[in-house]
Amino acid sequence: MSIFSRIAGTGSYLPELRLTNQDLVERLAKTGLETSDEWIATRSGISARHFAAENELTSDLALKAAQAALSSAGITSSDLDLIILATSTPDHLGGFPSTACVVQDKLGAHTACAAFDVQAVCAGFTYALATADAFIRTGSYKKVLVIGAETFSRILDFQDRGTCVLFGDGAGAVVLEASSEPGILSTALHADGSQRDILCVPGRSGNGAVHGSPFMTMDGQAVFKLAVKVLEQVAHEVLAKANLKPEQIDWLVPHQANIRIMEGTAKKMGMSMDKVIVTVHEHGNTSAASIPLALDCGIRSGQIQRGQHLLLEGVGGGFAWGAVALKY
């Protein structure tokens, strides 16, 4: 008998500190950087974002989202076989121990539960979900916790108006479990390392020092142009694998990078924005957390219902992109 995977539960978490555009404008003005609510909103669709407290780590955000997802699925951490965490802002310099291992400990999961991180920036959750699905299909694991969590505020240059107004912190999680009926229908992952410089943190660490900038940089125009192109391509690819057409998709749950990218992708897919889950206005770009955050919000709002077909897609630094078609 074939083994499939399905989403059994979802959860999300946002840090307590919420900054509206005006809050951020006033904060930046104190450092001599000028911007405006209108400038931010018209270019990105963002009205607010959340920032982690100084003592909050990526694992703390991930833990809250994970606990909510476990509760939603009706299981406990002792039921888990594997934890996969997508992040570009791990707890530890160098990325080890993995933030997934930290979350495993904080959850109280047993040592039989494997744990590791994946890193594909804003496409990270699609990579993590596709990996979890593959593990379940092989019969290796039955219950996998998949998390996307970021504290991007830690790597923002608050003298760079083009990036510091766009990003926020948060976490989202799903419990993926083995099923006799298909839930995840198809996945597709891609990367183009030749485009690595258009969205990156250029600095490198060595001998106890950081060489180059420790903050993210972005060529916004290049990212926009490439993102819309590859998102359309991977969406068609993953739908073809699932034998679905765009009109059969009930909800598009995209990476919440920028309202213009989401509108551009929906238009190319021939989909109305009424069928797109949009949270970027309240969350900003939360990188690997954005898709599971949007998914959980769509479910909790009652928009997304069991039995509906969803298309998840994301694109990020690397350049990396991916998509997942599923029946919720």
Curated annotation (Swiss-Prot):
ACP-binding as annotated region, ranges: 256-260
Location(s), subcellular: Cytoplasm
EC number, UniProt record: 2.3.1.180
Keyword set includes Cytoplasm: yes
One MF annotation (Gene Ontology) recorded for this entry: beta-ketoacyl-acyl-carrier-protein synthase III activity
Pathways involved: Lipid metabolism; fatty acid biosynthesis
Keywords from the named record: Acyltransferase, Cytoplasm, Fatty acid biosynthesis, Fatty acid metabolism, Lipid biosynthesis, Lipid metabolism, Multifunctional enzyme, Transferase
UniProt keyword annotation of Transmembrane helix present: no
UniProt-annotated catalytic positions: 122, 255, 285
CDD domains in the record: KAS_III (cd00830)
One GO term describing the cellular component: cytoplasm
UniProt record, GO biological process: fatty acid biosynthetic process; secondary metabolite biosynthetic process
Family from the record: Belongs to the thiolase-like superfamily. FabH family.
HAMAP family: FabH (MF_01815)
Function per UniProt: Catalyzes the condensation reaction of fatty acid synthesis by the addition to an acyl acceptor of two carbons from malonyl-ACP. Catalyzes the first condensation reaction which initiates fatty acid synthesis and may therefore play a role in governing the total rate of fatty acid production. Possesses both acetoacetyl-ACP synthase and acetyl transacylase activities. Its substrate specificity determines the biosynthesis of branched-chain and/or straight-chain of fatty acids.
Description of how the protein assembles with itself and partners: Homodimer.
Protein's UniProt name: Beta-ketoacyl-[acyl-carrier-protein] synthase III
Gene name as annotated: fabH
